[in-house]
């Protein structure tokens, strides 16, 4: 985030709620329509705010897009950390991501991954934020995998960080195939096959 944004006065509770609503609505619109297909006017209408409010929180579209990237990454990581820290965390994680893919047929792709093709080559700041989001996501998966190592359910010679990156790459590739083919089968097959291979001792 740029210095101008970070140096702004602290938001009031009401202001924070308004800003959060703008970001949530922007995230939904961008996931549905893409970055190029979403205007500040679209977001203003969806969030039910005035033009002056919109400009107060987000003077330009780049700042809003960056906030959406942070929001999507944080939402994904928080949700998955909660599941991975539960009993049978990895199994619960597997069920969660596959259920979501079946429900949506991967329409729109991954909330974070779908932004890569739109922004990574043209916007260095956005690319850095997306990369940071994936790093946090991989770390959350790695933390969840460590319980399997502790229980002896994964070979000791497999590094949890490496396996987390592999799972994340498999997840993203599986979502892409499911999106193209219009069904969740490729996604489910990819995740289940990798988990089965990783658990072999």
For the regions a protein language model found, what residue spans apply to each?
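Helix-turn-helix
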Residues: 2, 21, 25-63, 67
């Amino acid at each position: 985030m740029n210095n101008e944004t970070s140096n702004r006065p602290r938001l009031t509770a009401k202001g924070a709620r308004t800003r959060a609503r703008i970001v949530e609505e922007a995230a939904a619109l961008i996931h549905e329509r893409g970055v190029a297909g979403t205007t500040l006017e679209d977001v203003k209408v969806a969030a039910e705010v005035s033009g002056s409010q919109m400009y107060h929180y987000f003077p330009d579209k780049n700042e809003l897009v960056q906030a959406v990237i942070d929001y999507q990454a944080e939402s994904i990581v928080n949700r998955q950390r909660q599941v991975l820290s539960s009993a049978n965390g990895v199994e619960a994680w597997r069920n969660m991501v596959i259920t979501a893919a079946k429900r949506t047929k991967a329409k729109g792709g991954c909330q974070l991954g779908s932004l890569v093709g739109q922004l990574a080559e043209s916007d260095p700041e956005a690319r850095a934020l997306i990369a940071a989001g994936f790093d946090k996501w991989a770390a959350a998966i790695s933390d969840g995998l460590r319980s399997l190592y502790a229980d002896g359910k994964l070979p000791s010679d497999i590094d949890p960080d490496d396996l987390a990156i592999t799972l994340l790459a498999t997840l993203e590739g599986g979502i892409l195939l499911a999106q193209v083919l219009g069904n969740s089968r490729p996604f489910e097959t990819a995740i289940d096959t990798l988990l089965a291979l990783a658990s072999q001792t």
